């Protein structure tokens, strides 16, 4: 999770999403949007903090490098990893993060709380088709989608129960 903080009422989404992420998942974060959710104690997984703060907007590239290295080590690509990217935006730095991710071919990125003004409906539709770019909506439904990468989760599935 990364990007800008903004006074937009939709920013509560990010805090709620971090509350819902299961205890066996890591949260890698950078940029000022993290100040909405970084004060909570997320605990650890085998001694590794669940919440890893990488710093400012510019440092999102470090998270990208980690994902690329992990994909290379596993002999796959970033889009095949069980990783979801959720960006909040307000200004140019967050847009630069999005451009970097798109340039690298990363798909399935969630952005919000609303689309950037320059993303006309036509441009957004092209990015949606080519990169599976998504607007944030409901944290519970989005998390279900993130964990299943497009596979439908039955309402009685363990993840569905965990989100309730």
PLM features: what roles do these ranges have?
Residues 1-164:
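Anaerobic metallocofactor- and corrinoid-dependent redox/one-carbon enzyme cores
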